[in-house]
From Swiss-Prot:
GO terms for biological process: aspartyl-tRNA aminoacylation. The gene is aspS. Residues 201-204 are annotated as: Aspartate. It comes from Parasynechococcus marenigrum (strain WH8102). L-aspartate binds at residues 177, 223, 461, 506. One of its GO terms (cellular component) is cytoplasm. Keywords: Aminoacyl-tRNA synthetase, ATP-binding, Cytoplasm, Ligase, Nucleotide-binding, Protein biosynthesis. Its EC number is 6.1.1.23. This is Aspartate--tRNA(Asp/Asn) ligase. Signal peptide: none annotated. ATP binds at residues 223-225, 232, 499, 551-554.
Length: 610
């Protein structure tokens, strides 16, 4: 039906007869001559319809609407000098139409314009409801092609490194791995349920036991959790596992993988090696295990300086086992007024959103004099002032913002404020479209964190991470005592403040695996019922193994310069886990429920029947 793509025509095609197919992007009537911008996935080209050269084509062109599907025959010619368009790849040429065939018309009004000239003005709800139309837009088309290029680049690298792609089951059993499972009732096995996999974690470990040695998969995963801009109920991860490799070898190989992807997709040579930081240092210096290292404003712990001062908010926090930390905002004196920092202000509100009661502040003036409001200034000795200035490195014009309270809340609040101010003050661009790629390995995570509400330990990553041998007693009878404080041989790759992927070395000893499951509160009988197959596999000569999984949706979001993974997925869900286009999820017939041996207990809170 066509000889060329619309966006492929160049000066070397001049005088060629071509056939093009595509959609009408725009139509312009210039007093007897009609111009059509014809668009397909390759781009857009200008069609000139002159009644003297094609009366029938002109008659068709007079009544065309945007998004009408056309086949156009004509001759490529150079555009006259005054009509050259350097914003288009095809801007040096146009096609003189000799024939136009309408392949399909648009019936009724379009829900929104598709043309690149109008695409930024459409509400996301409309875009998702009519996703098939939204996908015609250049931005979405480019994103999906970039996604395909990313996956292809990963496959090429991994296959060159001896990995093989293996599919793992989508229907499996529910296990306590972390997030809530999506579960499906079994019709054949009444009263029993499948679960959709949150990750292929156990299956890829079993593949290592099976001697596969190097596995990868572009895996679909499912988690029934609260959503946000970079989460979906169903998502894709590049899943990798390998045997007979230590942590250093795994990190190096995955650095090479990332570098090959960035080179193939962006044409960028990333600097290596990627920096590394321990989890403890990340939390102390940035308040998060996903630090954005493109800018400064690191957190400074000043608890020891203010622990005895008369300002009870500070001294009380330290005495109760918490912390006082601050961030130094360069140029903050001029950029941030008191109104913005005090209650009701935007900066104050960011701290509150993270659970903090608020912020305290000090302004560093010329001559390194400090200025504050009320009790802070009045209760700081000259020695404490100098210690604060020395430790924070604050210069004149710097604003010091303080958080005080339990350490976790202080970290969370100052991390949020830090990220907010970096965008507000232009330290990073407000969107992800930038040329800064600050990769960072975060290593030495704790194995566990204590859940005070449930009075038990929880695995920080998952209960299959191997502990650091330095932190584990060689006497197995001591494991119950030494495991809670152990570091995991786990690692996350962070890019510009977002977790790009994470993994660990795995436990390959069944006795240690049982002890870890007991540490997270799983009784031996339940552990055997849930994970007996894994324990049996570890007992038949499981090799040392480890791996990593990258979030494909998030990786493509960063590569594409988007703010939401929804713009990198063909048919995403909303933050309410709904597909607005198909109206999923939806109800099912009573007969289907009967066949599945399931009854619904749902009561509509509105009081209306479904």
């Amino acid at each position: 039906m066509r000889s060329n793509g619309c966006g492929d025509l160049r000066e070397q095609n001049i005088d060629q007869q071509v056939q093009l197919c595509g959609w009408v992007d725009r139509r312009r009537d210039h007093g007897g001559v009609i111009f059509i911008d014809l668009r397909d996935r390759s781009g857009t080209v200008q069609i000139k319809v002159d009644p003297d050269l094609g009366a029938e084509a002109f008659a068709v062109a007079e009544h065309l609407r945007s998004e009408t599907v056309l086949q156009v025959a004509g001759k490529v010619r150079a555009r006259p000098g005054e009509s050259l368009n350097d914003k288009l790849a095809t801007g040096a040429v146009e096609v003189l139409a000799s024939g136009i065939i309408v392949l399909n018309n648009v019936k009724g009004n379009l829900p929104f314009p598709v043309s690149v000239h109008d695409e930024e003005n459409t509400r996301e709800e409309l875009r998702l409801r009519h996703r098939y139309l939204d996908l015609r837009r250049k931005r979405m088309n480019d994103n999906l092609r970039l996604r395909a290029q990313t996956i292809q680049a990963a496959r090429r690298f991994l296959e060159d490194e001896g990995f093989i792609e293996v599919e793992t089951p989508v229907l499996t059993r529910s296990t306590p791995e972390g997030a809530r499972d999506y579960v499906l009732p079994s019709r054949v096995c009444g009263g029993e349920w499948f679960a959709l996999p949150q990750s292929p974690q156990l299956f890829k470990q079993l593949l290592m036991v099976g001697g596969i040695e190097r596995y990868y998969q572009v895996a679909r995963c499912f988690r029934d959790e609260d959503l946000r801009a970079d989460r979906q109920p169903e998502f894709t991860q590049l899943d990798i596992e390998m045997s007979f490799m230590d942590q250093e070898e795994i990190l190096q190989l995955n650095e090479s993988l990332i570098c090959s992807i960035w080179k193939a997709v962006k044409g960028i040579d990333l600097p290596r090696p990627f920096p590394r930081m321990t989890w403890h240092d990340a939390m102390e210096r940035y308040g998060t295990d996903r630090p954005d290292t493109r800018y400064g404003m690191e957190l400074t712990n000043v608890s020891d300086i203010v622990k005895d001062m008369g300002f009870k908010v500070f001294s009380g926090a330290v005495k109760s086992g918490g912390a006082v930390k601050c961030i130094a905002v360069p140029g903050g004196n001029d950029a941030l007024s008191n109104v913005r920092i005090k209650p009701g202000g935007d900066v104050f509100s960011e701290a509150q959103k993270a659970g903090a009661g608020g912020l305290a502040f000090i302004r560093v003036r010329n001559g390194c004099e400090i200025d504050s409001i009320g009790a802070i200034k009045d209760n700081l000795s000259d020695e404490q002032k100098q210690e604060l200035l020395s430790r924070t490195g604050a210069e004149p014009g710097t604003l010091l913002l303080f958080g005080a309270g339990d350490t976790a809340t202080v970290n969370k609040a100052l991390d949020r404020v830090r990220q907010y101010l970096a965008k507000e003050l232009g330290m990073v661009k407000a969107d992800q479209d930038n040329d800064q790629w600050n990769f960072l390995w975060v290593v030495d995570f704790p194995m566990f964190e204590f859940n005070s509400e449930e009075n038990r330990y929880e695995a920080l990553h998952h209960p299959f991470c191997a502990p650091n041998a330095e932190d584990l007693s060689s006497d197995a009878s001591q494991w119950a005592d030494t495991l809670p404080g152990a570091r995991a041989q786990a690692y996350d790759l962070v890019l510009n403040g977002l977790e790009l992927g994470g993994g660990s070395l795995r436990i390959h000893d069944s006795a240690l695996q049982r002890q870890v499951l007991q540490t997270v509160g799983l009784p031996l009988e339940e552990a055997q019922e849930q994970f007996g197959f894994l324990m049996d596999a570890l007992d038949v000569g499981a090799p040392p193994h480890g791996g990593l999984a990258f979030g494909v949706d998030r990786m493509v979001m960063l590569l594409a310069g988007e703010e939401s993974i929804r713009d990198t997925i063909a048919f995403p869900k909303t933050q309410q886990a709904r597909c607005l286009m198909t109206n999923a999820p939806g109800g099912v017939a009573d007969k289907q429920l009967e066949e599945l041996h399931v009854a619904s207990t749902w009561v509509d809170p509105s009081g209306e029947d479904d």
